[in-house]
């Protein structure tokens, strides 16, 4: 298959910590991997600041977080995408029980949605992680369960409290791993059939690291994390049953001279598990690492200019042939070809031009 669906969330409301809002909201494109042509199929501006999206495996449903700084509580909205007439239809929305809603993840069995709230407190609900059921029609149930993280880290500006930044699920399913930037921890939870979240384990990263996004090796043995605050990338061994993690390796995600003015963002693993890609805001690059399959250790192979500014989010096509970089402050999603043998990226010069892209997801 050479054609895929590309879902894009773009900023459409100003926020004090973002540099402008020039986007529509939620957009859907058809991408031809042979011609590199992207054709817009649908869009809606009815969802506020969809800074993160998850898309069902068949591309029929999309779940969008709304990150609005003035709200004491965020929302997550469900949309249905109909391929036949290329339309987006609103399904429903649910409160996120926390503020600055940062991330979400569809469980591997498709039955639940997990949401992470960065959280600023400020008098509203203050839950860090929330679980929802996904109904047969794709709509979301009311929240099934939630948990709150507590604590702080050594960085007084960014780690004054817990800040859950992302959530994923182990390859075998049933265990969620949450990256909390504020407390330098990865926290694992058992996901109950009824949506309950029971804490299993906590893993502490180096002080001031600021874990943001994580990615799993395809075979589930390793977990990798981009640390936003100290511009490093870490690899850990993972027990998918117990949720236990053990630190293997930490490497700089940018050259030494760039670390002071850089904030790591997203992370992707190639389909064959041999390469890791991490985005650097400030250095405006995509770091390329090879992964030792026996040990999980990382080796830096390259730094590729991101084709714009502020690469907030990355996504690989299902074939692994191309990587998309959502360059927030350049109003474009740059498209790179990828060498499967070396892992290296080449800017194709092609892009999806769209205002303040925050998240890009690609599915068949």
Tell what function each PLM region has.
Residues 39-45, 89-95, 151-158, 198-204, ...:
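A short beta-strand motif characteristic of beta-propeller blades
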Residues 16-24, 68-75, 121-127, 179-183, ...:
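Short, solvent-exposed loop/turn segments at conserved positions within beta-propeller repeat blades
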Residues 48-57, 97-108, 120-121, 150-172, ...:
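Beta-rich, blade/repeat-based domains predominating
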Residues 173-230:
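Loop-centered beta-sheet repeat module
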Residues 329-337, 346-364:
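Blade-level signature of beta-propeller repeat domains, shared across WD40, Kelch, NHL, RCC1
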Residues 39-110:
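Blade-loop segments of beta-propeller domains
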Residues 29-36, 78-86, 131-141, 189-196, ...:
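Short loop/turn segments immediately following beta-strands, especially the blade-tip
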